[in-house]
Amino acid sequence: VAEKQPVMSINSDGGIIIDSTVIIDGHEDLLPRVITHIHSDHIRRLRASVQKSSLLIGTPLTLEWLKVLGFKIPDSKIVPLNYDQSIELGELKILLREANHIPGTAQVVVETTDQRIVYTSDFKKPGERTPILSADTLVIDAVYGDPTFRRPFDDYIDEVLTDLIRELLAKGPVYVYGYYGKVQEVMDILRRNGLDAPFVLSHKQYVLAKVAERFGMKFGDYLHANSREAEDVMRDGWYVYFTHLAASRRTPNGLGNHVLLSGWEFNKPFKRLGSRRWLVAFSDHADFMGLVRYVEDAKPEQVIVNARRSTAGEKFGDYVAKKLGIKVKLLP
């Protein structure tokens, strides 16, 4: 009997539709939707899904964080899946596996009777903190798909970031700007690296941290920016203040040093942007070599590069086809 290939497509949201049965990180009316994590490019049209999808599937942390971000998801539609837990939808088995990106991020494994499809979602540290999953078809977002997008310092960036913040704290408060989820990851890293200054958080970052603690993350001493305790701490001038990257566009106040977190820097681990402004090349995504390593070790029969969430997806696809000899499709 010939193998029945699952029908797969990618829509204009970057949503991955498999066998007209499920969509991952995108919206189609009535279809169950898997949400790999809370970043905006993966939750496009989520309000439509809250209204019209039959089910919303994700890790418990991701689903709780979405509520903090203002999505009112009816309990009847919520399907929390822990890592290594699965659910059957029609003839498909859906399994979530860990990805090292922001807390709660999942890779998605979809199994049919004779095919195994893996969507990596966003990841970094493949083979170390992100398990590399074998697949017949591997769907990947080539976020850093150009061969020049390499950060040789990725392996020690956590220490660089901690050392810089520690050094700047000696001169006064430090303001750190990052996306939702990335801030909580950095708080965790700083604590694990022994930084003990109090953390002060803007409202939404604070609520996200509170939820993450229920799921086992530990952030030590942190305070809501509007609390009386935070006022006292800020008067002392020894603290790290975390807020969303968007806030860095406003003129910083006269206090302290300001550190922006961004993966779009490939020459050095950190650089000075101004007298008290710094950029640290702290990324939540694997660089070009990390993407290649994942594909190489997963040994898929074919790779589908998700063009909607890739930068230089064509270059990445060409590299995989020529250097690794694997069949590649760029969709949509």
How does the language model describe each region?
Residues 2-3, 11, 225-332:
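C-terminal regulatory/interaction regions
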Residues 97-110, 123, 128, 137-147, ...:
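Active-site-proximal loop/helix segment associated with metal-binding centers of metalloenzymes
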Residues 31-38, 49-58, 71-83, 91-94, ...:
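Active-site regions of enzymes building and remodeling cell-envelope glycoconjugates
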Residues 38, 61, 99-102, 121-123, ...:
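Active-site metal-binding loops of divalent metal-dependent hydrolases
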Residues 43, 63, 105, 126-128, ...:
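Short, well-ordered alpha-helical microsegments
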Residues 6-26, 79, 124, 214-250:
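A short, well-structured beta->alpha microelement
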Residues 131-134, 146-233, 302-332:
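Binuclear metal-ion centers of metallo-dependent hydrolases, dominated by the metallo-beta-lactamase
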Residues 2-28, 32, 39-177, 193:
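His/Asp/Glu-rich metal-coordinating catalytic cores
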